[in-house]
Amino acid sequence: GLTSSSIEMASKGNLGIEINLSKVPCREANMSPYEIMLSESQERMLIVLENGKEEMAKKIFDKWNLDFAVIGQTTKSKKIELYFNEEKVADIPVNTLVENSPMYDRKWKKAKLPKRIKVDKEQFKTLKVKNVLNKILSNPNVCSKEWIWQQYDHTVMGDTIQKPGGDAGVVRVHGTNKAVAASVDSSAVYCWAHPLSGGKQIVCESWRNLISVGAKPIAITNCLNFGSPENEENMGEFVECVQGLGEASAYLEFPVVSGNVSFYNQTKDIGIKPTPAIGGVGLIKDCKNMVTMNLKEADNILLVIGKTEGHLDQSLFARD
């Protein structure tokens, strides 16, 4: 809602914000200032514009039939000042609600990692590659998801230039040669096997998927799904996953611009595996430079990058 979006932006910018709540579009009549500030509406955004660009923004929103209203301005006061019907109804220092607010300090302990599966290389040598491949490709976590995405129209408005099934979806930007690439990735087993490395890996996977279609990665959002934070090991998984996410995004200069946390995902006190999901977006400056995953011609060269040993301990191959 307006509370978190306005205060967080003011805090990050080291500024204040003045909002006229009488100008906020509301679905219900006679909403109080308290209700307006706490109401959470899906797909509603708060944007800070450069002065003088209001009409330019309005034309864009009008084109797509979206509600748009100028509801306030940034200030140097470092306070959140709210007005309703020409009366000031709140005047609070921003840092009181952000940097200086009380924080949870939950107890946590390092998650107990699952036992490593002993890989018998000699036994694997007796397996038939065809049988192994068929079994792996039939697993729900690996198999084609076409049966899902073929059920909806992924070419609405004719802007899709790379359809589902590749490393990332790509849609063109109207009036330009540019395109936006998007990928959503998650790996619960990896994060369960090693939360710190799993957190790093999921950010890197999003990055790799975007560059694989020719895009420059810009930013990510996350959805962090975990068990009860009151369980110290579950909380430990969360702490280490978030640490991994942070380290990888900082190293790759791939900022996390938004996200949410979902706790208490459990059945009979048994929590789910740590499941951070990452949504990444990137920019392709010229659609002509977009890359697809299919081989282009005979004698294409295939490369393996990085070490290929020591990754089987919790792999689908070893577990199944």
Where are each of the predicted segments found?
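Glycine/proline-enriched, intrinsically flexible loops and inter-domain linkers
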Residues: 1-320
